[in-house]
Amino acid sequence: MNDLTILVTASGSPGTAALLRALRVNGERRVRLVGTDMAELAVGRHLCDAFHVVPPGSDPGFADALISICEREGVDVVLPQSTYDLPGLAAAQERFPCVVLVSSVDAVRRSNDKAETYALLDAIGAPGPRWHRARGRDAVAAAARELGYPGEEVTVKPLESSGSRGFRILSASADPLDQLLTNRPGVAPALRLEELVALLPETGGPELLVMELARGKERTIDGIARGGRIVLGHPKTREAMRVGLAMYFETLEDPWLMDVAQAIVRELELDHFFNIQLVGDKVIEVNPRISTVVYQDDLNLPYLGIKLALGELSEEALAAHASRIRPTRRALRYFEQVEWDV
């Protein structure tokens, strides 16, 4: 079997070390890893065979920078990790000299724009939070009150964001002093509505998504899709949050969650890796990219997804791996470090 060169973007992100290890220790072939990141201090510099600093994913020159690296490094596959990398890669994927594991421009846009995502959920009858999009202090205040504020807590976030960036809970009982004294580092404080609107212009400004606060256990469905069909995937929990990151995961067996995911994947016509996040029974986010993986010795999702994209594995052969998914599987994320001299 031929050696592979895989380029992994955002190689300073939290899941990078485990992902690179899974790609390298695949049991079949030698893999050469090329990491890219917008930051010099990315762990990919130390864990990959080659490393390049690139512009941010939102930069117009991002895709051209990656194309140049792919040509110089002889890359076979590009595996993006960051939401912000997807639009540029999707728009330019036909110009790459290799396979890029990204969905279509339309699928990426509809997934990344949370208002588009929630409109899609409403249209197909998938469970999602009640929501409004609003711009300016009066519109945001009216949207919050329509969702039950001050009697109910509501949430706000930008239309396009990644992870918990920009996410805030609006609570009439928010106590700034108590939060100052008791919140752990990295926990964003709740705001009163009047505190938020004081930050907003009367008209214009950023467009926000104002939503009901979903409550309950966090779960995701992670998998590999082709042409809007889930070929292989499974649900898992997201637990033990620290600085905005889940640190503990349990693989689940839940047909209802898989049905919800299939409806969304079909409507978006997703390809390659995807991650769909729920809080309680409400879908809150669709990520058309790889996310945290619960690895098994006999089930290497990242490597299998690459083999499917390269045509080395049929959909039927990939789907047969579903029998290996173990609901007993657990994963605990922890902090590690590397050292070097300059």
Task: Tell what function each PLM region has.
Residues 4, 10, 73, 241-244, ...:
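ATP-dependent carboxylate activation and anion-phosphoryl transfer catalytic cores
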Residues 45, 61-65, 109-115, 164-166, ...:
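Short, charged, surface-exposed secondary-structure boundary motifs
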Residues 3-7, 153, 209:
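Residues that mark the start of a beta-strand
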Residues 181-264, 280-282:
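Phosphate-binding site of ATP-dependent enzymes
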Residues 1-104:
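ATP-binding N-terminal substructure of ATP-dependent carboxylate-amine bond-forming enzymes
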